[in-house]
Curated annotation (Swiss-Prot):
Biological processes, Gene Ontology terms: L-leucine biosynthetic process
Cell inner membrane in keyword set: no
GO cellular component term, pick one: 3-isopropylmalate dehydratase complex
Protein name per Swiss-Prot or TrEMBL: 3-isopropylmalate dehydratase small subunit
Length: 196
């Protein structure tokens, strides 16, 4: 997983509420265990429509998706963040993410950014009026910068640490190996394990 600190990207808007994981990537793609190429399957059932936003030339190279409320609802599938990342998205902005999707996204290095409804409406409007908008994301300070506006967003400390350092949960534990061994050694010396 690549570390995330700050990045700049263009954003595209997909202002549809309740986009579920089957719409993000249909179940027929879940047999694949290789992330490569999944970006081509992102929203595949909608990509047949010529007017779909991700089919437009201006959407190519977009790194931020501005989505509607309740993004990623439905069944758990790690393939959903994989497909979003495969297309090139580094972050998704919404007012709410389904818990399972949010967890899968964070564990795979995709940043789910939660904003309030008026902010989402404003960003969506700006994006639709201009096709794309330029966005700067600063994870360290938990801020998004758009058109001279600074928007703060919440993220839990553990997820933030993992994203900043480019590690998943296992990588985090492995990085603590020396401290864990030192604790175990000192703990074993203090605890009587005879008869245990």
């Amino acid at each position: 997983m690549q570390p995330i600190n700050t990045f700049q990207a263009k954003a595209v808007a997909l202002p549809i509420e309740n986009i579920d994981t089957d719409q993000i990537i249909p179940a027929r793609y879940l047999k694949v265990t290789d992330k490569n190429g999944l970006g081509e399957a992102l929203f595949t059932d909608w990509r047949g429509e010529p007017d779909f936003v991700l089919n437009q030339p201006y959407a190519q190279g977009a790194g931020v998706l501005i989505a509607g409320h309740n993004f990623g609802c439905g069944s758990s599938r790690e393939h959903a963040p994989w497909a979003l990342q495969g297309f090139g998205f580094q972050a998704v902005i919404s007012t709410y993410f389904a818990d399972i999707f949010k967890g899968n996204a964070l564990k795979n290095g995709l940043l789910p950014i939660v904003v309030d409804a008026p902010t989402l409406a404003r960003l969506t409007e700006q994006c639709l009026a201009n096709q794309t908008i330029d966005v700067s994301v600063d994870l360290e300070n938990q801020q998004v910068h758009v058109a001279g506006e600074t928007i703060s967003f919440p993220i839990d400390a553990f997820s933030k640490h993992c994203l900043l350092h480019g590690v998943d949960q296992l990588g985090y534990i492995q990085a603590q190996e020396t401290a864990i061994q030192a604790y175990e050694a000192s703990h074993a010396a203090r605890v009587n394990t005879v008869g245990a």
